[in-house]
Curated annotation (Swiss-Prot):
GO terms for cellular component: cytoplasm. Coiled coil: none annotated. Pfam families: CTP_transf_like. It is an enzyme of class 2 (transferase). It is found in: Cytoplasm. It comes from Synechococcus elongatus (strain ATCC 33912 / PCC 7942 / FACHB-805). One of its GO terms (biological process) is coenzyme A biosynthetic process. GO terms for molecular function: ATP binding; pantetheine-phosphate adenylyltransferase activity. The record marks 16 as: Transition state stabilizer. This is Phosphopantetheine adenylyltransferase. It catalyses: (R)-4'-phosphopantetheine + ATP + H(+) = 3'-dephospho-CoA + diphosphate.
Length: 166
């Protein structure tokens, strides 16, 4: 069975990678699907996020990165996926995730949502938190792959400012 793992991944974190790696052990193919949402202003473009994710999952032969727009259930059908993979960090995540799972089940009764709890060491981690730490010059290499940390640093601290910080 194939699964999709949808999200904004702005940026991808070790928490996301934890879910992807574990999902790859459960499913034949996992499509890491970057949602193209015209109503949001992400830090990284869709293309940048696709490249960041592709590099981060290169070691996983049954993971593939893609982007989509519109309903998740339609994308799942397009990819012939029988499951939507979702990660849960804390209890407060569950309420919204359950609401989305029930909506998706109503729209596509043959599609299951599979929840994986994030490993304990990543339970506090979010893309928003990573961006906040990076914005104030903190080291984010414990939270994201090194190529993503470099991209964050470049985004928040251009070359001119970088010289001042070092």
């Amino acid at each position: 069975m194939n699964a999709i793992y949808p999200g904004s991944f702005d940026p991808i974190t070790f928490g996301h990678l934890d879910i992807i790696e574990r999902g790859c052990r459960l499913f034949d193919q996992v499509y890491v699907a970057v949602l193209r949402n015209p109503n949001k202003q992400p830090m990284f473009s869709v293309q940048e996020r696709l490249e960041q994710i592709a590099k981060a999952i290169a070691h996983l032969p049954n993971a593939q990165v893609d982007s989509f727009e519109g309903l998740t259930v339609n994308y799942a059908r397009q990819r012939q996926a029988g499951a939507i993979l979702r990660g849960l960090r804390v209890l407060s995540d569950f309420e919204l995730e359950l609401q989305m799972a029930n909506t998706n089940k109503t729209l596509a009764s043959d599609l299951e949502t599979v929840f994986l709890t994030t490993s304990t060491e990543y339970s506090f981690l979010s893309s928003s938190l990573v961006k906040e730490v990076a914005r104030f010059g903190g080291n984010v290499e414990h939270f994201v792959p090194s190529h993503v940390a470099a991209a964050l640093y470049d985004q928040f601290h251009p070359v001119v400012e970088r010289d001042r910080l070092t």
